[in-house]
């Protein structure tokens, strides 16, 4: 088992990574919390697979357990479902000393974390991510939120978990498309800060190669995410590097109303398009885009889109990195090295090119 400490002063916590970790989560939580009751927030798909198992694991450690399942999918990440979860916590008569556990991918993780931050002005919460995207990205860093009609993650908070438990065995039930979806974020980490991780992806040729290296990919990704979170907990500076590919990716998601493309697929297209254009503009080392696209295609991830750039740009202007008439783009200089580039919003068309 590997352990990564996220050093945030009084908000510090540990991320544990290891196969079979789920079976010992009850004992670990007993050491980390004084809770008598634990609410498990998950979705209906994960509940069917792991609901009874997590209930028995936590009951075996002496906790009173309630499993709260929301409908699977991004459409559930809204204020109505958020309110339903809060009412369920109140109905379970939870006190401020009790705890919430998210057993899920990103949607219940984000929504459940925001519920933990909000219920009685904050109760302890822990994360057990069940998708590769959640294991390497959304479960690390304390961003919790729900979507509004106007856009993704517009209502939320920074609220760190008390612990994260990553069990790669939980990925065995994940459809291949969603494994690759999550790995887009791992490729991103390679592009912005870990050249060796990127080269590891270049060396992977088969499904067996990927399975053999998945723990290393998870660990290196978590270390990269942790580094940026420790430097910039509240996302005002270097942590924005983690948004490589996301300005275009989020625009694609908004354009298609969060259907058609997964988050990781949108990010893959965003990285590919921005890298190609920044290479043409002289910001990115020659050849990087070809290498990036080769890795993305190996993972069956898209690298282009048949939508005119002028239709994506209005959606890109909703990006959280926009400040007034300026937007910050994350530009890869070379494999493993990126920087933030401030671009006037009227010049965004020079950077978002889909042809």
Segments the model singles out, each with a brief description of its role:
Residues 199-310:
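Active-site segments that bind and position negatively charged phosphate/pyrophosphate groups
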């Amino acid at each position: 088992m590997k352990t990564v400490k996220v050093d945030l002063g009084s908000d510090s916590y540990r991320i544990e990574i290891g196969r079979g970790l789920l079976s010992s989560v009850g004992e670990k939580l007993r050491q980390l919390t004084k809770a008598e009751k634990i609410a498990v927030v998950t979705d209906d798909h994960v509940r069917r697979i792991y609901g009874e198992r997590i209930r028995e694991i936590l009951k075996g450690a002496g906790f009173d357990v309630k499993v709260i399942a929301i409908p699977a999918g991004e459409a559930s990440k809204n204020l109505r479902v958020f309110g339903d979860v809060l009412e369920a916590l109140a109905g379970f008569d939870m006190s401020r000393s009790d705890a919430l556990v998210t057993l899920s991918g990103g949607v219940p993780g984000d929504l459940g974390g925001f519920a933990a931050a909000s219920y009685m002005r904050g109760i302890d919460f822990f994360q057990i991510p069940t998708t590769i995207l959640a294991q390497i990205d959304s479960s690390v860093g304390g961003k919790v939120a729900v979507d509004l009609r106007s856009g993704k993650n517009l209502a939320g908070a920074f609220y760190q978990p008390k612990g994260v438990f990553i069990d790669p065995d939980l990925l065995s039930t994940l459809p291949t498309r969603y494994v690759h979806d999550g790995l887009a974020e791992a490729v991103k980490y390679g592009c912005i800060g870990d050249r060796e991780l990127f080269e590891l992806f270049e060396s992977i040729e088969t499904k067996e190669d990927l399975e053999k290296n998945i723990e290393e990919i998870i660990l290196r990704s978590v270390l990269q995410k942790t580094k940026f979170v420790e430097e910039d907990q509240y996302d005002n500076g270097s942590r924005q590097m983690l948004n490589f590919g996301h300005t275009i990716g989020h625009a694609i998601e908004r354009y298609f109303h969060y259907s058609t493309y997964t988050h990781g697929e949108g990010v893959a297209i965003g990285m590919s398009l921005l890298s190609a254009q920044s290479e043409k503009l002289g910001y990115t080392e020659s050849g990087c885009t070809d290498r990036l696209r080769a890795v993305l295609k190996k993972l069956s991830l898209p690298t282009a889109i048949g939508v005119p750039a002028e239709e994506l740009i209005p959606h890109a202007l909703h990006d959280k990195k926009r400040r007034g008439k300026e937007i910050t783009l994350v530009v890869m200089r070379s494999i493993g090295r990126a920087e933030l580039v401030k671009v006037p919003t009227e010049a965004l068309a020079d950077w978002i090119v889909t042809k």
